[in-house]
Amino acid sequence: MLRAFALDPIGTVSIEEMSSVGLLKLSTRTYWRRVWPAGVGLASYIVERFGTEGLRDRDVLDLGCGVGLVGIVCGRLGARVTFLDREAGALAAVRRNCRRNGLAPARTIGGDWNHGGHRVEPDAYDLVVGGDVVYDDLEWPAIGTALMRTLRAGGIALLADPGWVVQRKLRGAFRRSGFTVSRSRRRVSWPPWRTTHLRTKDINIYELGRQPTLSPKGRGQGEGFTSRARSVS
């Protein structure tokens, strides 16, 4: 199923979903086949947060990329994007969706990021994005470790959640992992490809900041982003 997402000012992003799997048959191994509200909210937030120039020539990692909406939006904004997912089918879908949206061939990495089984270069990314990757609080320490390993000093992660997690608990977990934590909220209409019978969903966007170091190593380190989210209380 081909879905179209209108995101000014970059225009329409077309994403192929693997919608042959019905909702009742979804499992953690098939969630990647669909675009979910958190991904739509995160994509919209990224466009507003960075505009048309804020991600140009930045290195971005789409963590648990699924069919690739969020990473493709970053690519349309001029970023160099790496897509990471444990499912080979997801990475194949990303490659098709990148071609569909006029992007260069996608750089993809297969692996289970939350158990250290991936091959992501350390200290290589200015921004890490992830929609619906924080639903299991038992995985938060592993996510924190992965983010600390992959982000450059001064880099940030943007993680989207549709209200499944306890905010204060998440804040504490990632602060213990060494990050600053702030939050924004994005309201999305769902499903976005309809004009009637829409529901609204509030999406929490958590911004995790890795502090710059005094002697950054590698391209772009220490050239961090300015936070625009409000602190979580």
Regions found by a protein language model. Give the residues of each.
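S-adenosylmethionine-dependent methyltransferases
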Residues: 1-211, 233
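Short conserved micro-motifs on helix faces and helix-strand junctions that flank
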Residues: 129, 216-217
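Glycine-biased, low-complexity coil/linker segments
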Residues: 218-222
